[in-house]
């Protein structure tokens, strides 16, 4: 049963966060001349404004999962196999904003079934993994800078994770062996969120968050492009990646989930 060097993987995950954090702050440096129409100037809201954003997420999954009874195993779902392995992947976000202050909520649910071959010499030939992951973030933000069509917020909060995995071995001397386990943990995360209005109806946004707590590492990064096709409602497309490294009493969840997202947001 193969195990991955957790320190090396943790370092690689940490490096994934840096480009996204830079992207979130870098939206401020986009030249206004790039837009054919002058972008709107942000006006601090005097009353509460609410934004609701449901998405579909074509998330691939890659990393180590394990239980005390089965040991730690590697699983992956490449983008080309998402249609086969991904059962459900949805997420929704909400924001309430007044002036420079904002309240944020983010919910995510992913259900996957992966099938991977095991290396020569392993006691089984194939491994099937049923994985369900639920993640919820609740936090707040404060606007650090507003200039023209750009805004940069500092963001922080608490993320709660729930993961349930079942491992089934096929072939070899342990054909039919299986094990399942579940865990819940809580992390604190912080980072930056940025927006830049390319035109009055087209907007680029990004965020990068990282932290930890009960897990060794918790991170989340995304870049989105939105088009307001009618006042108050926008179509959104982009890419999101998030990961966590949690280990406790033989339970291992050291996984990166990433892929394109497509959805809408409504502002009220």
Model-predicted segments: where are they?
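Cleavable N-terminal export/targeting peptides
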Residues: 1-47
């Amino acid at each position: 049963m193969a195990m991955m060097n957790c320190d090396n993987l943790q370092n690689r995950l940490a490096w994934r966060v840096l480009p996204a954090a830079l992207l979130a702050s870098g939206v401020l440096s986009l030249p206004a001349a790039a837009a054919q129409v002058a972008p709107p100037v942000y006006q601090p809201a005097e009353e509460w404004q609410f934004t609701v954003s449901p998405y579909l997420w074509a998330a691939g999954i890659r990393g180590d999962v394990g239980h005390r009874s089965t040991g730690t195993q590697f699983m992956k779902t490449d983008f080309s196999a998402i249609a086969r392995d991904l059962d459900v992947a949805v997420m929704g976000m909400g924001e309430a904003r007044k002036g420079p202050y904002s309240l944020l909520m983010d919910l995510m649910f992913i259900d996957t079934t992966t099938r991977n071959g095991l290396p020569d010499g392993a006691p089984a030939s194939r491994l099937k993994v049923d994985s369900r992951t639920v993640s919820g973030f609740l936090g707040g933000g404060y606007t650090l800078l507003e200039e023209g069509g750009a805004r940069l917020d500092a963001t922080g909060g608490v993320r709660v994770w729930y993961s349930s995995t079942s491992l089934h071995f096929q072939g070899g001397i342990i054909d039919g062996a299986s094990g399942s386990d579940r865990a819940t943990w809580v992390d604190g995360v912080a980072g930056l969120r940025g927006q830049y209005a390319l035109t009055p109806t087209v907007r680029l946004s990004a965020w990068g968050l990282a932290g930890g707590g009960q897990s060794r590492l918790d991170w989340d990064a995304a870049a989105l492009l939105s088009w307001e096709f009618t006042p108050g409602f926008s179509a959104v497309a982009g890419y999101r990646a998030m990961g966590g490294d949690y280990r406790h009493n033989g339970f291992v969840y050291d996984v990166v989930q990433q892929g394109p997202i497509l959805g809408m947001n409504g502002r009220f």
